[in-house]
Amino acid sequence: MANSAQARKRARQNISHRNRNMSLRSELRTAIKHVRKAIGSADKNTAQAAYQASVATIDSIADKGIIHKNKAARHKSRLSSAIKAMA
């Protein structure tokens, strides 16, 4: 239990930061799912448009430190490879 005023404030901040981080992480997963769904639809133009939108989201979340920049690069690379592999 937080006893000092400083510890109580940090506990409050941790809750709000955790909620924000969970929301952003969910946004990341949703962006990736949209691209995967577009790839599954076999429409390359739609997939590329979804990919472009997701890249901005992925980079934004990586810049905020929610995920590591290498993880962001890995996601983008795999999505890009999947789009390039489309016929």
Swiss-Prot record:
InterPro entries linked: Ribosomal_bS20, Ribosomal_bS20_sf
Start and end residues of each stretch annotated as Disordered: 1-25
Species assigned in the record: Nitrosospira multiformis (strain ATCC 25196 / NCIMB 11849 / C 71)
GO process terms (BP): translation
Molecular function as annotated in GO: small ribosomal subunit rRNA binding; structural constituent of ribosome
Bias (Basic residues) ranges: 7-20
GO cellular component: cytosol; small ribosomal subunit
Family: Belongs to the bacterial ribosomal protein bS20 family.
Keyword Ribosomal protein included in the entry's annotation: yes
Task of the protein: Binds directly to 16S ribosomal RNA.
Name of the protein described by the UniProt record: Small ribosomal subunit protein bS20
Keywords, in A-Z order: Ribonucleoprotein, Ribosomal protein, RNA-binding, rRNA-binding
Gene for this chain: rpsT
NCBIfam families: S20
